[in-house]
């Protein structure tokens, strides 16, 4: 059985998840709010675990898992760094960028789950990991809206 499509889809999600992990780590460093920084560190760890789970699935399919983030993710982190420099690490700007990143990764996983060419094993692994992605998205969204309510 040719697993190349599954491996390709999974590796794309791995790169996106590693982007997210790195983004959370950088957001934790940029945050001046200890509660937010702790949330960002927790999410970085969760994303590291999701990437590890997906990498294991690629190995089980006989593939070489992606071990690094994407070029697009590096560009986004560069934009976040530039925006932080311009806004002076404004907490609202950091949280807004985190939520934007969450919208992106959630969309990537949702698109992958709609892929009719995926094997049941790959789909199952993606769906399992999506639970963490969805929860992270919802928490980031709640954080953003809570900050907006305070303003």
Where are these regions (language model features)?
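Conserved alpha-helical segments that form or flank metal/cofactor-binding pockets of metalloenzymes
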Residues: 35-73, 140-144
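Secondary-structure edge/capping motif, primarily at the C-terminal ends of alpha-helices
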Residues: 24-31, 58-61, 86, 113-116, ...
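Alpha-helical scaffold segments that form or flank carboxylate-/histidine-based iron centers
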Residues: 6-13, 34-53, 91-97, 121-133
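Carboxylate-rich helix-loop segments that flank metal/cofactor sites and access channels
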Residues: 56-106
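Charge-rich, acidic-biased intrinsically disordered regions
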Residues: 38, 45, 65-82, 122-132, ...
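Preference for long, well-ordered alpha-helical segments
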Residues: 94, 98-151
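Amphipathic alpha-helices that form helix-helix packing interfaces
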Residues: 13, 20, 27, 50, ...
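Alpha-helical bundle segments that constitute or directly flank the non-heme di-iron/ferroxidase center
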Residues: 2-31, 93-117
């Amino acid at each position: 059985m040719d697993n190349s499509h599954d491996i390709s889809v999974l590796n794309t999600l791995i790169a996106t998840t590693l982007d997210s992990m790195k983004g959370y780590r950088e957001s934790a460093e940029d945050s001046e709010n200890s509660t937010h920084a702790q949330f960002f560190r927790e999410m970085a760890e969760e994303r590291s675990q999701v990437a590890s789970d997906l990498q294991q699935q690629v190995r089980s399919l006989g593939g070489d898992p992606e071990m690094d983030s994407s070029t697009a993710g590096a560009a986004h982190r560069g934009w976040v760094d530039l925006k932080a420099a311009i806004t002076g690490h404004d907490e609202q700007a950091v949280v807004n960028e985190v939520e934007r990143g969450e919208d992106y990764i959630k969309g990537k996983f949702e698109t992958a789950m709609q892929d009719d060419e995926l094997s049941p094993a790959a789909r199952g692994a993606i769906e399992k990991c999506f639970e963490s992605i969805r929860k992270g998205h919802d928490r980031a969204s709640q954080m953003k809206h809570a900050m907006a309510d305070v303003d």
